[in-house]
Swiss-Prot record:
Any Gene Ontology CC annotation: plasma membrane
Species: Mus musculus
GO MF annotations in UniProt: calcium-activated cation channel activity; osmolarity-sensing monoatomic cation channel activity
Lineage: Eukaryota, Metazoa, Chordata, Craniata, Vertebrata
Protein name: Osmosensitive cation channel TMEM63C
Effect seen on changing residue 455 to K: Does not significantly affect calcium influx induced by hypo-osmotic stress
Subcellular location: Endoplasmic reticulum membrane; Cell membrane
Membrane topology type: Multi-pass membrane protein
Top-level taxon in the UniProt lineage: Eukaryota
Reaction equation(s) it catalyzes: Ca(2+)(in) = Ca(2+)(out)
Mutagenesis / variant outcome for changing residue 546 to A: Increases calcium influx induced by hypo-osmotic stress
Protein encoded by which gene: Tmem63c
Effect of residue 451 to K: Increases calcium influx induced by hypo-osmotic stress
Length: 802
């Protein structure tokens, strides 16, 4: 196909503009230099304001006394913006860092000068992998700035398609004539960017070895076991007969413990309240409280529901009631057995042999039989390596088969329609235009209206969407936390890329247009016009403004943590007593959400890579975002979040997504070549070939990486014991939390027996109050409970992965 002359390029460009965007649309109207200078200045001003505001709040909340801050300080700013001293004991915080952190803005400079070693010692090995990943992206984008600004940008600018008045448009690929040989540079660099990125991700993977602790255990998880089997000896007998020499050391049955876990949480909460008010009553006398959830919002004492009651008696009676309900449910749990068991064997080779025997059972292969085969029905079993006990979400094990898949499909179908069709910012603003809401401002033609507001709106949706995905993952009821986190990583990234990059880029700016594009066969005949929307200069400016907003306003708001503030305020206003508020404060020490942060960062990285060739000015702003994101994450990981231990598969998922990002740039170049120079042009053929080669290389690299890891684990394991695989006779010192039994079933009466409750003694008994030392000891144990649980869990899981 012959190339169009420059006049045809200009005519086609004008037709595309009129077709992609309505004349009154406030989304991507043409502005001087795309409105980028205005958006940049506004974001700098807002970033400075947010940082100064955060510095003030942080200084006002500064307190080195951890216990005083947690128990006695009711300051809202202290509870939200307090330092890591809220989450760790003073011995875990560097005294030198505290001494250097006394100035108004010293926290900012400390984040810049903080050594990686200090961050890793404080936050663990996952933090090291995360910041190393950021280092690779920063260096990669820094290298991309050289050809993007030094070669591609001048080539675009010297083009002759657009007028000299089109300042921003002249920096894009639209300004390059279809007859120009310089278009070869764009295709070559798009392929080169992919290869460089692949090399950087390969180098990053050398820095850590993904490990699955489940391959180092000698425990198998077996499903579809008949629930009528109550005797573990039947399971042991089957394995002894079917696999001679096999020694079963332990068999754990699983039960439906959803209600039991909820009751246990409630009675523990009541116990905390009783301990707190018993100790307080000894010092200050009887304490009266309001028990209605909205009592903090209403000061009226005339209503019955807002009457004050004796706090100690209220929590004592509540604890007694919940303990009775718990014990009754505990007796019923034995009748709620699930068709799932955990079987631990003596040696790892036996585990490998049994696992291989059941690996292909779904393909019609029959496993070995025994004299009890008709009872255990092992031909229906599904066998897998058992995850770490601390990784299992026990209350979700009862949701299986049809119910689980129905729930999963329904939730994700709803999210699909919500994010793809309804919440794209361009769709929302165009829908507003339909109802003439924007008519009063259509004559303003202000970059603040046409560029800054849509970019802020897009950023707001990219912040809200991962939160909804994160909450939906809990509704999906995954069996393990690792699978739940992996789902969050992949879903967030896929939804973000479609919502931010693909749909708006292709000009699908209204639900009506999308449905026509999807179903109207006559409308599809004009699909060429729609795909031209990818290469409009204003389209590139919109995404540059989005990257700028994410780099400045976005990172500033990550420091503020408004989500935590809103959550805290809601929970605080609905709390009924001081113990609940103490518990809420301690719960502010949440884990750093690596999956969510990976998705946010890689979404912006994908935007940069998609437009790095067609709109090269976006690359330095992408570098700005990565640097600002890195500094913000360093601060948040060190000061604001609790240490986190993850399955390394999450880090590998981020690597795969980063490898995918440059493919968007290759897709965009292929679309441009097909639409502008024809499907049989040599540049189009080269773009298609490079895209196919890149896809093959990417998938081959992912496949070979997974195969290499799988082969490593296929090798015979060393006879290394894990703490939950040892013989029963040697588990006297084994923590019960490391057994394949739900925690609530291990020692359900620990520290919560009805005999320890004052409610059991005060009615008709004398001298039944616990000793003061006992109460204070219980209160101290309550204060330590949340502090150590998360970090200890991370240490246990880390120990299993080595």
């Amino acid at each position: 196909m012959s190339a169009f002359p420059d006049s045809m390029d200009q005519k086609f460009h004008n037709m595309t503009v009129n077709e992609c965007f309505q004349s009154r649309s406030t989304v991507l109207q043409g502005q001087p230099f795309g409105g980028i200078p205005t958006v940049l200045v506004l974001n700098i001003i807002l970033w400075v304001f947010v940082v100064l505001l955060y510095s003030f709040l942080r200084k006002a909340a500064w307190d080195y006394g951890r216990l005083a801050l947690l128990i006695h300080n009711d300051s809202l700013t202290s509870l939200i913006y307090g330092e890591q001293s809220e989450k760790s004991s003073p011995s875990e915080v560097s005294l030198e860092a505290e001494r250097r952190d006394r100035g108004f803005s010293s926290w900012f400079f400390n984040s810049l000068t903080m050594r990686d070693r200090d961050l890793i010692n404080k936050c663990g090995d996952d933090a090291r992998i995360y910041i190393t990943f950021q280092y690779h992206l920063i260096i990669f984008v820094l290298i991309l700035c050289i050809p993007s600004l030094g070669i591609i940008l001048p080539v675009n600018y010297i083009g002759t398609v657009l007028d000299w008045n089109s300042h921003f448009g002249r920096t894009t690929i639209v300004n390059v004539s279809t007859e120009s040989k310089f278009l070869w540079l764009h295709s070559l660099f798009a392929f080169l960017y992919f290869l460089i990125n692949l090399a950087f991700m390969g180098h990053h993977c050398l820095g850590f070895v993904p490990k699955k602790s489940l391959h180092f255990t000698r425990t198998l998880m077996i499903t579809y076991v008949p629930t009528e089997i109550q005797d573990p000896e039947i399971i042991s007998k089957h394995f002894h007969e079917a696999y001679p020499g096999c020694v079963v050391t332990r068999v754990h049955f699983c039960y439906d413990v959803r209600n039991l876990i909820d009751l246990d949480d409630q009675r523990r909460h009541a116990m905390r309240g009783r301990l707190y008010y018993t100790a307080k009553a000894k010092k200050t006398g009887k304490v009266m409280i309001k028990t209605h959830p909205c009592s903090r919002l209403c000061f009226c004492k005339c209503w019955t529901c807002f009457k004050e009651v004796d706090a100690e008696q209220y929590y004592s009676e509540l604890e007694e009631q919940l303990t009775d309900e718990f014990n009754a449910e505990l007796n019923r749990v034995q009748l709620k057995r699930l068709d799932l068991i955990f079987v631990t064997f003596q040696d790892a080779r036996t585990v490998r042999r049994i696992y291989d025997d059941y690996k292909y059972i779904h393909c019609g292969r029959h496993p070995k039989q025994s004299s009890v085969t008709t009872i255990v029905k092992n031909y229906h079993w599904r066998v897998a390596h058992a995850p770490h006990p601390k990784d299992i979400i026990w209350k979700h094990l009862s949701i299986r088969r049809f119910s689980w898949w129905t729930r999963f499909i329904a939730i994700n179908t709803f999210l699909f329609f919500l994010f793809f069709f309804l919440t794209t910012p361009a769709i929302i603003i165009n829908t507003i235009d339909i109802y003439n809401v924007t008519r009063p401002i259509e004559k303003l033609q202000s970059p603040i209206v046409t560029q800054f507001f849509p970019s802020v709106l897009l950023w707001a949706f990219t912040v809200t969407m991962p939160l909804l995905v994160y909450l939906s993952a809990f509704l999906e009821a995954h069996w393990t936390r690792s699978s739940q986190n992996l789902i969050i990583v992949h879903k967030c990234y896929i939804f973000l890329v479609f919502m931010v990059v693909i749909l708006p880029s292709m000009g699908l700016t209204s639900l009506h247009v999308f449905l026509r594009w999807l179903f109207d066969i006559y409308y599809l005949e004009h699909a060429t016009i729609r795909f031209q929307c990818v290469f409009l200069p204003d389209n590139g400016a919109f995404f540059i403004n989005y990257v700028i907003t994410a780099a400045l306003l976005g990172t500033g708001m990550e420091l503020m943590r408004l989500g935590s503030l809103c959550t805290y305020c809601t929970r605080l206003f609905l709390s009924k007593s001081e113990p609940e508020r103490v518990h809420i404060r301690k719960n502010q020490a949440t884990d750093f959400q690596f999956g969510r942060e990976y998705a946010w960062m890689l979404n912006v990285f994908s935007v940069v890579m998609a437009y790095s060739i067609t709109c090269p000015i976006i690359v330095p702003f992408g570098l700005l975002y990565l640097c600002m994101k890195h500094i913000t994450d360093r601060y948040n990981m060190y000061y604001s979040y609790a240490p986190t231990k993850l399955n390394a598969q999450i880090h590998m998922a981020a690597v795969y997504q980063a490898i995918f990002a440059p493919l968007l740039g290759l897709f965009w170049m292929l679309f441009f070549s097909i639409l502008r120079v024809g499907s049989l042009h040599s540049i189009t053929l080269f773009s298609m070939s490079s895209l196919i080669i890149s896809v093959v290389i990417a998938f081959s690299g992912v496949f070979l990486g997974k195969l290499r890891i799988a082969q490593r684990y296929e090798q015979p394991e060393e006879e290394t014991e894990t703490v939950f695989d040892v013989e029963p006779s040697s588990t006297t010192s084994t923590p019960t939390s490391l057994l394949y039994v739900a925690t609530v079933l291990q020692e359900p009466e620990l520290n919560l027996t009805p005999a320890s409750s004052p409610a059991r003694h005060t009615y008709g008994t004398i001298n039944s109050q616990p000793e003061e030392g006992e109460e204070e000891s219980g209160l101290r144990g309550f204060a330590r409970e949340l502090d150590s649980a998360q970090f200890q869990e991370g240490l246990e899981m880390e120990g299993q992965s080595h």
